[in-house]
Amino acid sequence: MFVELVYDKRNVEGLPGAREIILNELTKRVHQLFPDAQVKVKPMQANALNSDCTKTEKERLHRMLEEMFEEADMWLVAE
């Protein structure tokens, strides 16, 4: 399975290392649900979640992603 998060890079302008921070957090959370998944992030000018998973698995991914960004103030910070 692969999981690719496409995110709007304009939302994290000014945050050094944003791509790596997002990739690390997403990988950690996806691997809790799907340990063998390949995880990628792609900074673009839109938001999307791409995967080759089933509809049920995609629903789980969307819930996880929503929770992840609701908690962004805890992990999406410059170190």
Curated annotation (Swiss-Prot):
Affects survival in macrophages. Keywords: Virulence. InterPro entries: DinI-like_sf, DNA_damage-inducible_DinI-like. PANTHER family: DNA DAMAGE-INDUCIBLE PROTEIN I-RELATED, VIRULENCE PROTEIN MSGA. The lineage of its organism: Bacteria, Pseudomonadati, Pseudomonadota, Gammaproteobacteria, Enterobacterales. This is Virulence protein MsgA. SUPFAM superfamilies: DNA damage-inducible protein DinI (SSF54857). Coiled coil: none annotated. Belongs to the DinI family.
